[in-house]
């Protein structure tokens, strides 16, 4: 069985521009919010705080990448990445290293194999 490609074949993912990226947890497991948060504003779980920590570090690791906006949902995250310089970094490398850093700190695999994007 063939896996559907998530990337545009003819597009360079290191081109300057904005990228809307979604990353899901493995098996859609709800890991990032506290389950019994009594308030209307969601409270991040320990795993969710780790995700936020590494989202905030992306810009220091990749100076040509800005995290314009992000939302941490119970079982996935959304972010808008702005690549500000050609050839400085590509979206796949940024996401691979982000996911790896979170996995290493948490000591468990939390991510779905790939990520989804809109260019």
What is each PLM-predicted segment?
Residues 1-119:
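Short catalytic/metal-binding and nucleic-acid-binding patches
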């Amino acid at each position: 069985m063939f896996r559907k490609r998530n990337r545009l074949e003819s597009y360079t993912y290191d081109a300057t521009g904005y990228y809307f990226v979604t990353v899901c947890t493995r098996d859609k497991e709800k890991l990032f919010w506290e389950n019994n948060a009594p308030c209307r504003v969601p409270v991040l779980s320990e795993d969710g705080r780790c995700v936020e920590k590494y989202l905030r570090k992306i810009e220091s690791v990749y100076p040509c990448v800005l995290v314009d906006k992000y939302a941490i949902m119970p079982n996935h995250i959304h972010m808008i990445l702005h690549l500000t310089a050609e050839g400085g970094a590509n979206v796949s490398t940024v996401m691979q290293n982000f996911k790896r850093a979170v996995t290493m700190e948490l000591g468990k695999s939390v991510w779905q194999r790939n990520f989804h994007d809109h260019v």
